Amino acid sequence: MRATRRQFIMAGAAAAVAVACTPTVPATGGRACPAVPGLGGPTPLPAPGSTGLVDEAWFSARADSFLEVGTASLSGGDINNVVAHLIRARRDPSFTWDPSQVSHTLVSGDPFRDTDDFELMYCQWALRLGRGVLPAETIAGIEAKIIGARYRYNDPLPAGTVDNKWFWSENHRGMFACDEYLGGLALPDATFTFTGLTGAQHAARTRQVVVDWLKERTKFGFFEWHSNTYLKYSYAPVLTLLEFAEDPEIASLAATVADTAMLDLAANTFHCVFGASHGRGYKAGKLSYSGESSFNTCKLLFDNTDRPFNNGNDIGPLYLIGQSRYRVPEAVRRIGASNDVAVVRERHGLPLDPHEPYSLQPVAPFGYDYADEKNLPFWWSTGALTAWQMVPVSLAAAKKWNLFDTELFQKFAKVKDFLDTSPGLAQVVVR
């Protein structure tokens, strides 16, 4: 039988650090070596505290140290600060705070604003943890936000309206799928604004999208190579699914992807700084550790730096702490905490050769047909918006869905004239 990807990571990583761990039954309080998991198909997640996962008392202490920062004061208009308070209250019955001070307008009302999917993900946590705790008006506003969201670029759009959201990068694809699936499950009987579908129908149509995106990560890794900005926004929706999705297949896949992301951090950090070569890196993250989006996650898990947590509302560690069913493998923690020198060999992405010989029907790798619009989100998430193989379908979709009117596509608007002449000519020019 074949091991699942998660079992492979746990077993392989455990073998790699076996020389550094104590026997399975520690003699003097040292942590036990992770047990090699069995083989087979997807299985229920091992409960927190199980052999092979981080020590539960250790993790609880790390969580407390982070939440002390995040809940030092209440910012009633900051949804992530509110979620930090909700998570701490769920973990610690002795913790007291005043939910009545939370704003009734905790979320924005603009469904066409870029990064709206981020806020919709935050809503999943605030809604589920906040029902019966937060003011009724706040909960009603969150529910209205979920119902009134436009989750897909090809969902109906009122005439004359421009939707400036970016739907297609790796993290946005995962986040929108998470938002729609969990939002639909949370409000199954509500009628959603743009589609007229019920929440249950939204969840049903999105389940396979979620599964496919997770499987892509297990097969191809992360397209945004070691991004010290965006990796967090790829694993945050995975952690959200892990906590709130009841589907066994989704839970198993999400655990695999979460382990992979945490191992990616562990193998490529130095004193909690994600210091590998980067794709999609920005100035703030290049000049200082404090600008990296995963610093606090690494500080929580690996804690091999004296630098303090610098953002108590950071969703990376917050969503790990908020897990009731998932914990990081102990072997991954040890890799991240180790100062040993090692060679890391990785492969992320898939081959797309922009210099291959021109063809009217180029053959796509792994069966992701360039000419099929259903594969457009996949290819665009690899960064292949302007690859010559994708030009015809990219131009057609952009025109069909009025994407050239959006802020992020306006710079490409001049190329739409090729649609009225020859998309094939556009391919040749681009190549």
Predicted regions, residues:
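Alpha-helical scaffold segments in carbohydrate-active enzymes
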Residues: 186, 209-212, 216, 240, ...
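Extended amphipathic alpha-helical segments with heptad-repeat/coiled-coil character used for oligomerization
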Residues: 252-320
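Ser/Thr/Asn(+Pro)-rich, low-complexity disordered segments
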Residues: 30-175, 187-188, 197, 201-210, ...
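Inter-helical turn/loop segments and adjacent helix faces that build the functional surface
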Residues: 190-194, 241-253
